[in-house]
């Protein structure tokens, strides 16, 4: 067993539920020992407490008056999908092509309009733990062996293989100059776009216990890279050389035990002009000035390990209890909160047309009105569930189910 102090996805959800149920400190300490002693082992979360009884079971779905439906346009099988491990491999879009990968090393390119497979590359004996990146003419994935593999967007041929310090579970980002990856050991590394050689590395201080996952870094117009870390800080560094520009806390650790002090920034950041939005687990949702790091506004107790989306003048986030919340993007005012999907392990929200879309552990996609937060549409897209974030493209919704089915849907 590997001791690394990280909480994996299924365990992450179980921890949230256990904390919400108010379990005794002794029980929580036992969970910590389990996590730190067996990190990386694929366990069934329902067996944690040697009981068939679920802590905070997922809320049952109720009938809705559907105002919108999903019609499937095309679908493609992508290897073994999310595989047997708790991965969250999200595809990436560049131009009119979507790039997807499976946990067992299949990477492919699909025409967004027709669903035709343009190329397929099987990365032999490599397991992919995280999302796909696309930019600067490359498709980038990471391996469990701390490799970064860059493929040509047009052909799928391997351009280079770089080495980083740990596995990459967040989507890489890339431009014509560099590829930037964030690894689970809280390091951000820039690799040369052409050669794959390391250009710079930025390292943050990692707490004793963290959630397994990282947020995706973002490029800014100020020629910087902004990244969120497991110690609850948001950091801006120069894209040219990795030199520190500014740092600000999204959350402050509180509590006596390590598990109470987990404040990871795991969800993707949102860049909007001169502002950047971030949220943290057991922390806050904040808006900062991207040039200076100055906090513009903050919403306290907005615990989330998912990303944020934007639409209709609102920010949308999913809480650690799978509540979907709308907040004004100019202030911390809450517009609405939907608790109908409580504990259903929903994905990060995606804004599409007049709706916010999320998917859950049973494979249902829920369409929520951006205006009042009602669920107005529901379709099941994968019997094995959906963990990958949904994508929006020209009014169509792209899903990547756990079984490996990549599909595009129109809203009718």
In which residue ranges do the predicted regions lie?
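C-terminal motif of bacterial Sec signal peptides marking the signal peptidase cleavage site
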Residues: 35-37
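WD40 beta-propeller blade core
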Residues: 108, 149, 189, 235, ...
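Loop/turn-rich, solvent-exposed surfaces of beta-rich toroidal or solenoidal domains
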Residues: 314-326, 333-367
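Structural signature of WD-repeat beta-propellers
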Residues: 102, 143-144, 183-184, 229-230, ...
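Extracytoplasmic beta-rich repeat domains
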Residues: 41-46, 52, 67-92, 120-135, ...
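Bacterial N-terminal signal peptides that target proteins for export
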Residues: 4-27
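Short loop/turn segments that connect beta-strands within beta-propeller blades
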Residues: 111-114, 152-155, 192-195, 239-241, ...
């Amino acid at each position: 067993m590997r001791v690394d102090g990280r909480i994996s996805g299924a365990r992450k959800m179980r921890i949230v539920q256990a904390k919400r149920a108010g379990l005794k400190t002794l029980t929580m300490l036992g969970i910590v020992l389990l996590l730190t002693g067996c990190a990386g082992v694929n366990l069934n979360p329902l067996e944690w407490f040697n009981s068939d009884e679920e802590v905070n079971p997922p809320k049952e779905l109720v009938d809705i008056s559907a105002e919108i439906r999903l019609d499937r346009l095309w679908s493609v099988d992508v290897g073994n999908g999310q595989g047997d491990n708790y991965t969250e491999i999200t595809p990436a879009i560049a131009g009119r092509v979507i790039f997807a990968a499976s946990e067992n090393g299949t990477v492919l390119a699909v025409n967004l309009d027709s669903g035709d497979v343009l190329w397929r590359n099987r990365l032999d004996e490599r397991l992919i733990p995280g999302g796909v990146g696309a930019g600067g003419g490359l498709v980038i994935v990471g391996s469990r062996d701390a490799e970064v593999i860059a493929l040509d967007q047009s052909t799928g041929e391997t351009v280079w293989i770089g080495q980083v310090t740990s596995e990459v579970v967040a989507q890489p980002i890339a431009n014509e100059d560099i590829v930037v990856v964030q690894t689970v050991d809280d390091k951000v590394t820039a690799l040369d776009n052409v050669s794959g050689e390391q250009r710079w590395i930025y390292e943050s201080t990692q707490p004793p216990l963290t959630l397994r996952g990282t947020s995706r870094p973002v490029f800014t117009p100020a020629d910087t890279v902004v990244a969120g870390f497991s110690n609850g800080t948001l950091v801006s560094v120069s894209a040219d050389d990795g030199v520190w520009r500014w740092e600000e806390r999204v959350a402050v650790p509180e509590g006596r035990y390590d598990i109470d002090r987990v404040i990871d920034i795991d969800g993707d950041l949102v860049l909007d002009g001169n502002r950047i939005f971030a949220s943290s687990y057991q922390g806050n949702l904040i808006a900062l000035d991207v040039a200076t790091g100055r906090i513009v506004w903050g919403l306290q107790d907005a615990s989330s390990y998912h990303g944020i989306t934007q639409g209709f003048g609102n920010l949308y986030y999913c809480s650690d209890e799978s509540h979907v919340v709308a907040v004004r993007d100019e202030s911390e005012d809450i517009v609405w909160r939907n608790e109908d999907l409580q504990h259903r392990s929903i994905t990060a929200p995606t804004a599409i047309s007049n709706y916010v879309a999320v998917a859950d552990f049973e494979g249902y996609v829920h369409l929520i009105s951006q205006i009042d937060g009602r669920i107005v549409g529901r379709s099941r897209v994968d019997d094995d569930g959906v963990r990958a974030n949904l994508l929006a493209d020209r009014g169509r919704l792209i899903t990547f189910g756990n079984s490996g089915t990549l599909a595009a849907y129109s809203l009718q």
